[in-house]
Structure formats: C-alpha cells, structure tokens
Amino acid sequence: MDADKIVFKVKNQVVSLKPEIIVDQYEYKYPAIKDSRKPSITLGKAPDLNKAYKSILSGMNAAKLDPDDVCSYLAAAMQFFEGACPDDWVSYGIMIARRGDKITPNSLVDIRRTNVEGNWALTGGMELTRDPTVPEHASLVGLLLSLYRLSKISGQNTGNYKTNIADRIEQIFETAPFVKIVEHHTLMTTHKMCANWSTIPNFRFLAGTYDMFFSRIEHLYSAIRVGTVVTAYEDCSGLVSFTGFIKQINLTAREALLYFFHKNFEEEIRRMFEPGQETAIPHSYFIHFRSLGLSGKSPYSSNAIGHVFNLIHFVGCYMGQVRSLNATVIATCAPHEMSVLGGYLGEEFFGKGTFERRFFRDEKELQEYEAAELTKTEMALADDGTVNSDDEDYFSSETRSPEAVYTRIMMNGGRLKRSHIRRYVSVSSNHQARPNSFAEFLNKTYSSDS
C-alpha cells in the first residue's frame, strides 16, 4: 500500500492517485555574499554637486523629481558624511573598514558610474544663485531619503498618520544642525508624486546604505536615519516577531522553541536558522539584505514562517498587546491550531514570573541563602512520592516546563480551556479590529463560545 495515494471510484472505475499540490509557492533566496564583493549598483555620470543640489531642490518645490537624478545626487552626496569607524567592521568575510578608518556611506558598497549625463533640469522657480552649504546638502539628503519611509506606509494606516509623520520629519530637517530649505508640507506634496519610490531598486539600495552607515557611525547628521530606518530588517517581520517574542517571555531562542508543539514549525525553523547567515551579528549586511538587493524573496517574512508568526501573535493577543491584535493573520498557516497553542503558552507566560533572591546584605547572608536552597533541592530529590502524580504539575517547580505544558494540552484533548476563550474574547472585543487582524479572527472565532 502506497501511503501517499488515495483510492476511490468514478463511474464504477477504481482510481488510484497521489493528490499533489504546490505547498511552497515562493522560491526563497538567502542573502549570503559568496564572492566577497560589496553590494553594488550602477548609476549615471557623477554630477557637479552644486548644480545637482539646485536641480533637485527645484524639483522638490515643483513636486517633480527624476528618480535617476535623485539617486545620482544621493550617491555623490555621501562624501559629506565622513565618520570614524569605531571597530573593525567585517560582514560575510568582507572587510568594510578597520578601526579608526575615516569612512563614508560609499565605503559600505560599490557604486559604479557610466558616462550617461543626468537631466539636472530646473523646474521649480527661481534658481539658487549661491552654492549650497553642507547643512543644506544634509537637509536635502534627509528629505529625499524620507520619501522612502513615506512610500512604505501602507494603506492600512488610516487618517492623518502619514501626514503627521511627514510633518515630524520636516521639523527635524528645519532645525540645527540641519537648515530649512523648503516650505512646510512640501515633503508630503512631493511624496504624492513619488508614492511608489520604495519599489525603485537603486533608490532602495541607497536608502539601505545610508541607514547601515548611520546605524553604526556617530555623526552630526545621524538624524537622517529617520527616513531610512524602515530598511533595517525589511521583509523580516517573521524573524523580528520571533526576536521580540523571546525577549517578551524572557527565554533564549532554544528554550522558546521547545514549546513549539506542531509539525508545521519544522520547515519554518530550519528556514529561519539557515547556517551561514549573520542573523545574530550586529551591523551585518544581513540587516539590510533586502534594500541592498541581496535577496529576491525573503526567507524571514511573515509569509515565509507563517505558523511561527501566527503563534507568536496569538500569544501576544493573550497578553493584550496592541501590536499583536493589529497584526494580519496568515490565513494559510493553521490559525485555528495556532490559536489553541497560543492560548496555553499565553496562560503560561502571562501574569506569572520566575523569581529568586539575587542580592544580599553581605557575603554571610548569601552563603546562608545558598545553603538553604541546597537543602530544599536535596529534600525534593528525596521525595517519597506522597504527592498524587496527577497533581505533580502543581507542586513541581517545573510547571512551566515544555513537558508540563504539553501534558496539559494533551489532557484537554488539544482544545482551549474556557478560561483561554474568555481571555481571548476579552482582549479582542475591547479592541477596534482591523480587517484580517488577529483581533478580528479571535472575535469571529470565539465570541460565540464565551
């Protein structure tokens, strides 16, 4: 008998077949750099910076920017942001810089130039007659890169959210060490003409390069990062959620994974911790691999590890976290089963803590405490078994152990307890649910059972 086949009849004829479907529709690409070359892009001929500044500023005032010219200017303007490297900077075997080296954002990447001239048109009224200062260049760079952040804000954020962000960004680039170069609200007006610029590979690359630089190098103009910070861990919402989750429940990654009682986690965990990736190395190219063009399809997105993502946010919902209640459910990744496991894990880690004395008046008190704890441990090991085995969980110090939690789930037939359902309904019903969010899922699924 072939375990992969099913047998049935069609018009009295016996049919035997394997029901096969595409399980994983995405081809994930890991961002490892194997040729020891820095990430690179090719742009047009390097411009005269003074001429380029005047042209780009003119375009901003007219809400008419040429993306090729903007990218060419942003790459050339990197020379204004020199800083000292605090330590040897190595990523994927590439020596980016040595400690004490003077570097600019250009040091992180390889920007190649052709002989193709830019347009550098003047479209926005009167031409600036004098040459711009460095603070003016810094302000223009900051405003241009902020177009990336604004274009990444999704339509789910309703009301004046995007306008408020744009206003706050403009305020930053109107005050020292920056200088006001455009009228207020110009950024939002310009953004409407560049709403999809986050999809332009070269613009995305430059935003990621600036962000990687300013996230490590202390600099007078580090606030430029306000527009580029969204390039860090871009398309890594699954990995970022897992990192936040283990901090939230105060466990290591290894300890947390012992609670993941479902076969569908296996492939996702293998994918998330693929050997050779610099997931745990600060200031690595890994952090900006999407913007730097090192991967076409992220293996770390919420869709790539959907079961992990769903579980984490069901636990977050149980704990009443707004971020989890607002997150979007991955509908194809067993949300009903993940909500059950999330209820049990939420119960374990919500409103409970593991506490012990760690600080003492003097060394004598410390020694007395340690001796008393040792005696307790020895007594526990010599237990005569008078506690009913069914109640062992409630008397053992290991009630939070993966084994104890798994046993409770199995004893309840893999179903949520009424207390879990009441908690889910309580947190979700008091929250204004967004479409397809975890709050909406919990409301629709469990409100009738409460």
From Swiss-Prot:
<dbReference type="GO" id="GO:0030430">
    <property type="term" value="C:host cell cytoplasm"/>
</dbReference>
<keyword id="KW-1139">Helical capsid protein</keyword>
<dbReference type="InterPro" id="IPR035961">
    <property type="entry name" value="Rhabdovirus_nucleoprotein-like"/>
</dbReference>
<keyword id="KW-0543">Viral nucleoprotein</keyword>
<keyword id="KW-1035">Host cytoplasm</keyword>
<dbReference type="Pfam" id="PF00945">
    <property type="entry name" value="Rhabdo_ncap"/>
</dbReference>
<dbReference type="GO" id="GO:1990904">
    <property type="term" value="C:ribonucleoprotein complex"/>
</dbReference>
<dbReference type="InterPro" id="IPR023330">
    <property type="entry name" value="Rhabdovirus_ncapsid_N"/>
</dbReference>
<keyword id="KW-0167">Capsid protein</keyword>
<keyword id="KW-0597">Phosphoprotein</keyword>
<dbReference type="GO" id="GO:0019029">
    <property type="term" value="C:helical viral capsid"/>
</dbReference>
<comment type="similarity">
    <text>Belongs to the lyssavirus nucleocapsid protein family.</text>
</comment>
<comment type="subunit">
    <text>Homomultimerizes to form the nucleocapsid. Binds to viral genomic RNA. In nucleocapsid, binds protein P and thereby positions the polymerase on the template. Protein P acts as a chaperone on free protein N to prevent it from aggregation before encapsidating genomic RNA.</text>
</comment>
<comment type="function">
    <text>Encapsidates the genome in a ratio of one protein N per nine ribonucleotides, protecting it from nucleases. If expressed without protein P it binds non-specifically RNA and therefore can bind it's own mRNA. Interaction with protein P abolishes any non-specific RNA binding, and prevents phosphorylation. The soluble N-P complex encapsidates specifically the genomic RNA, with protein N protecting the genome like a pearl necklace. The encapsidated genomic RNA is termed the nucleocapsid (NC) and serves as template for viral transcription and replication.</text>
</comment>
<keyword id="KW-0766">Superantigen</keyword>
<dbReference type="GO" id="GO:0019013">
    <property type="term" value="C:viral nucleocapsid"/>
</dbReference>
<dbReference type="InterPro" id="IPR023331">
    <property type="entry name" value="Rhabdovirus_ncapsid_C"/>
</dbReference>
<dbReference type="InterPro" id="IPR000448">
    <property type="entry name" value="Rhabdo_ncapsid"/>
</dbReference>
<feature type="modified residue" description="Phosphoserine; by host CK2">
    <location>
        <position position="389"/>
    </location>
</feature>
<keyword id="KW-0687">Ribonucleoprotein</keyword>
<keyword id="KW-0694">RNA-binding</keyword>
<keyword id="KW-0946">Virion</keyword>
<protein>
    <recommendedName>
        <fullName>Nucleoprotein</fullName>
    </recommendedName>
</protein>
<dbReference type="GO" id="GO:0003723">
    <property type="term" value="F:RNA binding"/>
</dbReference>
